[in-house]
């Protein structure tokens, strides 16, 4: 018996975001380096972006928009949060994100509070009121 996917034991000790494949809403969990992601569980690591800030982006309406546009919708309205869809989400270069927006993203991701994540992402992408409304919020 052997797995299809290659096992990287060092990944266990890395901080990462864990994302289940099939979910109704984005369910992005910060993992501090104690668990290994197994089947149907995607992971994201980053040496550049703060993972809590990235968690806020992935919990926001913008991530759901990207995934819902590209993903196959499963029975019951569930979306597949697969790697190929998550890769389509464009994030700015972390070094170009203003310090105040960085902190807002990190704080929102750490809670995690969907409304706070959306507000931080609205600021990150400098979204208009119309764009914010399309994603389900006004940023207030």
UniProtKB/Swiss-Prot annotation:
Domain of life: Bacteria
The keyword Ion transport is annotated on this UniProt entry: no
Reaction(s) catalysed by this chain's protein: a 2'-deoxyadenosine in DNA + S-adenosyl-L-methionine = an N(6)-methyl-2'-deoxyadenosine in DNA + S-adenosyl-L-homocysteine + H(+)
Keywords: DNA-binding, Methyltransferase, Restriction system, S-adenosyl-L-methionine, Transferase
GO biological process: DNA restriction-modification system; methylation
MF terms (GO), sorted A to Z: DNA binding; site-specific DNA-methyltransferase (adenine-specific) activity
This protein's name: Type II methyltransferase M.AbrI
Group of enzyme by EC: transferase
EC number from the UniProt entry: 2.1.1.72
Sequence similarity: Belongs to the N(4)/N(6)-methyltransferase family.
């Amino acid at each position: 018996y052997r797995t299809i996917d290659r096992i990287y034991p060092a990944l266990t000790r890395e901080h990462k975001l864990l994302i289940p494949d099939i979910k109704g809403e984005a369910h992005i969990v910060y993992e501090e380096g104690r668990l290994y992601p197994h089947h149907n569980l995607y992971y994201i690591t980053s040496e550049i972006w703060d993972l809590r800030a990235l968690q806020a982006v992935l919990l926001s309406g913008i991530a759901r928009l990207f995934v819902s546009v590209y993903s196959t919708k499963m029975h019951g309205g569930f979306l597949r949060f697969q790697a190929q869809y998550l890769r389509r989400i464009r994030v700015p270069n972390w070094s170009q994100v203003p310090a105040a927006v960085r902190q807002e993203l990190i704080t929102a991701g750490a809670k995690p509070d969907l409304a706070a994540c959306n507000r931080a992402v609205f600021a990150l992408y400098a979204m208009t009121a119309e764009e914010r409304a399309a994603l389900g919020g006004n940023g207030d």
